[in-house]
A protein has these predicted regions:
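SF2 helicase catalytic motif II
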Residues: 281-320
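A short beta-strand element within the Helicase C-terminal
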Residues: 487-488, 493-510, 516
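Conserved small/polar residues in nucleotide/adenosyl-binding loops
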Residues: 515-521
């Protein structure tokens, strides 16, 4: 058959794949064809939900699974040999891959990001580089020594009974972190949008460094019990899979057992309370080799912050901060402590790739929010206390001034919205100013939805620190559990909780809107938020 009459698939089968195999690439372990690495952006038109086209590479060549080296873009013979190079370079930039090949069946155009001269050249089919050749170039480009190669090439954790695989951006973050640690870098910052799998990324980093014995004792720090308990049950369960040889523990009740290898703790659990010795000082300063600080913006990077004291005590350990939003203020800086992020994956990227769902904003204007409120002179509250005569606005509500009618109106507006859209059993979070506001909102919602509350009182639950409702968090996060449905909270669920069951979020507070929206944008459910 005339080559000009061949399809792209024919060119791949007859010319490109044989050339790659002849160069020594393993078909089963090192070559993947037609690799879709995004899910396709979700678009919503009224009630019709569609996914856009996925980004797909014709070939990706790997040194080892999840350590990609090259992209190969194929065209039929009616194209020039270098056609498709721009698209392939774009994909390579996204995937953090240094080598790009294009072919129309006449040979290869080879782009080498690591080359000092002749960045793009043409190769005959029998000149296609071997895996060892590209790996050697990769190592030189990245500064990977023979000594650090063992760490960099350490396998990812893989469970044949679990179909979960790291997404491309997680691989980028994991590989960059492992390479940085292998090269001797001791302070790292990873910035990944909420909902994109920071905890799973942290697990793979920890696993590879632990498995290579580069880091033998590891501390995972968070600021809330749920951000410790949930990962221990899910992403990190491997470390306690053998009940006779548990490698992971949680520091609690000031109890310290130094027989484990992976430790989880909340800041309050290791810094102690008033009247108690600082628990973390029960460990020697050199005890931990690696410390991960989850949601590191929350603990603050101030010199006197809780986690800062811990990190300075264990200053010889490699320390990795993970956050969706690095904290940069006059007095506080994550970047000053950890350095510039070694990898960033934003909310916008997550939505464009289809890993996060877009959100629709429904703004409800309440007159007191838009116009402000000023009490009449001498007006008293329900307790008989005179209200200060001044202008109040949305920043005052539910903190300096409680307008009960406003809370009732918010509950009614949202309840009416859910009824109108046949979504009364769509799991919904109400973010409130504080615990008292969350309690008032829960009461107002119960009154607005009395018919369903009578059927099951867990239809509305207040989920704030210290409340009974916190016990329902697991049920709220489980798709098969119908209750609770409407949850009010203040700070407890603002970050890190894996609640991809949520369909609606209500922001009746002015803090961290993008973070909270991002957290609920995991694309399990309809993207109508």
């Amino acid at each position: 058959m005339n080559k000009k009459q061949m399809s792209e698939q024919d060119i791949r089968t007859k010319y490109i794949t044989p050339a790659i195999l002849a160069a020594g690439w393993d078909r089963d372990l090192q070559i993947r064809e037609e690799v879709s690495f995004t899910k396709g952006k979700i678009t919503v038109r009224r009630k019709i939900v569609k996914r856009g086209e996925q980004k797909r590479a014709d070939y990706i060549l790997y040194w080892k699974p999840n350590i990609p080296l090259a992209i190969v873009e194929a065209k039929d013979n009616n194209h020039r040999i270098a056609d498709g190079m721009e698209q392939a370079l774009n994909y390579a930039e996204i995937l953090d891959i240094p080598f790009v090949f294009t072919s129309n069946g006449d040979g290869f155009s080879f782009y080498d990001k690591t080359a000092e001269h002749n960045v793009q050249i043409e190769l005959a089919f029998d000149q296609f580089p071997s895996p060892e050749e590209l790996w050697a170039r990769y190592k030189k480009f990245k500064g990977i020594t023979d000594a650090s190669e063992k760490v960099v090439a350490q396998d990812y954790y893989y469970n044949p009974n679990d179909d979960r695989k790291p997404r491309y951006y997680q691989c980028n973050a994991i590989n960059r972190a492992v390479e940085a640690v292998a090269s001797g870098q001791n302070r790292l910052l990873l910035t990944m949008a909420t909902g994109t799998g920071k905890t799973y990324t942290a697990f793979q980093i920890i696993y590879r460094l632990w498995k290579s014995r580069t880091k033998k004792r590891i501390l995972f720090l968070a600021d809330r019990n749920v951000l410790v308990d949930d990962p221990m049950r899910k992403d990190f369960k491997f470390f306690n899979a053998d009940s006779n040889n548990r490698k992971m523990t949680k520091i609690r009740d000031k109890k310290v057992d130094k027989a484990y290898e992976v430790y989880f703790a909340i800041y309050q659990g290791v810094t102690g309370q008033v009247g108690f010795a600082d628990t973390y000082k029960e460990f020697s300063p050199d005890f931990f080799d690696l410390i991960i600080v989850d949601e590191c913006h929350r603990g603050s990077a101030k010199d006197d912050s809780a986690w800062r004291k811990i990190l300075e005590y264990f200053k010889n350990a490699t320390q990795i901060g993970m956050t969706a939003t690095p904290k940069e203020t006059k007095d506080t800086s994550n970047i000053e402590y950890f350095g510039e992020p070694i990898y960033t994956y934003t909310l916008r990227q997550g939505i464009e790739d289809g890993f996060l769902a877009p959100y629709k904003v429904v703004r409800v204007g309440i007159d007191k929010d838009l116009e402000g409120y000023r009490p009449t002179k001498g007006k008293r509250d329900k307790y008989g206390i005179e209200i200060e005569d001044r202008e109040y606005n949305i920043k005052d509500y539910d903190k300096n001034l409680v307008l009960e009618k406003r809370t009732e109106l918010v509950a009614k507006r949202v309840s009416d919205f859910l009824k109108k859209n046949n979504s009364r059993f769509a799991k919904t979070i109400f973010f409130c100013v504080d615990i008292d506001h969350a309690a008032r909102m829960a009461q107002a919602l119960r009154n607005e939805n009395g018919d369903l509350v009578r059927q099951n009182p867990k239809y509305v639950v207040q989920m704030t620190s210290g409340s009974e409702g916190v016990k329902e968090l697991e049920n709220f996060m489980t798709a098969d559990e119908p209750y609770p449905v409407l949850v009010t909270t203040s700070k407890l669920l603002t970050t890190g909780v894996d609640a991809d069951t949520v369909k609606f979020i209500v922001l009746d507070s002015n803090r961290s809107e993008e973070r909270r929206v991002g957290k609920e944008c995991r694309s399990r459910w309809s993207p109508y938020h």
